[in-house]
């Protein structure tokens, strides 16, 4: 019995063969074209072509000036943007300079997953501001531009939930400028290095697990000016009186090195200068919802802390402020172990007169402070700790060789149990 192929006329077989050949040529050509396009996009001219398209798209989308100096795509692992500049709607700088490198699995994007291994920012300046009472932050137009697309698409079809995960965030030589006229905040900070590996990233529920947080070379200032009262009261009430909106953070270790910042609060008339050589802390619980922060241990080494205080005006509190104060009454900080070595503490309270004899407790200058303590608890009406060892020298000439006691300060009184004080000429033991 003859095969079906042999049963076909010769002319018909020739036509089928020609069609098959044409289709094979088309498929091979398409495959080669895809390969050539892919290879082209890996070349500098190809990536410059993409850079131009992305830059034009963002400018048309945001209706503001957007510049991207260079784009480097290493498929399928990373995207790097260099010399980025984005203006806000007032033609002031929003983001500028440096390099943004994102290491991610691009193939996961096809399954609606954003798996980011690391976000690395270098030599970046970000300026965030809200300069008028009835305006929003200067980055809000970006949120609005992209959120509008999500609203339009959701009305057409219900897409699957986007899964997002970030494993690590690194900052190198970054400056953050923050100004908010409503809250009165004015901040300008430079970060030499920050490393924040993330074990759990859940922005929908505001839950973040950051096992180790490292910050090196933080320098700058944070000023708190007089806020716009009605606005700030409302903002605080939303943040504090609605605990379901609270941030949830889990952390095992905090490492701070080479910190030099100035803090000034106009409402409280307090100025603080912090120069921390090294601070290490191991949190046990960071409960933002209940305002309770517990640490296993805190260690401060070779640091300078200066505190300036002045008289404050008594202001009649609003009902909202009183309600917030009641919630804040649960605020507490505790630590099982505290260690301070080779540090300097200075206090200058201008509301207290200067004393020219003995130790002036309103104008202290303590050098070579070494302190070991345990069971520290601080809240709005109680301070307590067990001082195991303490020594320092003070500008008045007073020298403390050794101190240990269990102290308790409350709104109703003070107690010092198992008090032991040793100076060059005195030894004191008693309970107060």
Stretches with model-predicted labels:
Residues 2-63, 123-125:
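N-terminal type II signal-anchor transmembrane helix
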Residues 52, 385-389:
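Short Pro/Gly-enriched beta-strand edge/turn motifs at strand-loop
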Residues 43, 67-136, 148, 154-226, ...:
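Flexible beta-edge/linker motif
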Residues 134-140, 227-234, 312-319, 358:
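Flexible, surface-exposed loop regions and adjacent strand-edge segments
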Residues 406-407:
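Feature captures outer-membrane beta-barrel proteins of Gram-negative bacteria and organelles
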Residues 47, 92, 395-399, 423-427:
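Solvent-exposed loop/turn segments connecting transmembrane beta-strands
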Residues 235-241, 321-322:
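Short, flexible domain-boundary/linker segments around small modular repeats
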Residues 6-13, 52, 140, 145-160, ...:
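Sec-dependent signal peptide cleavage junction
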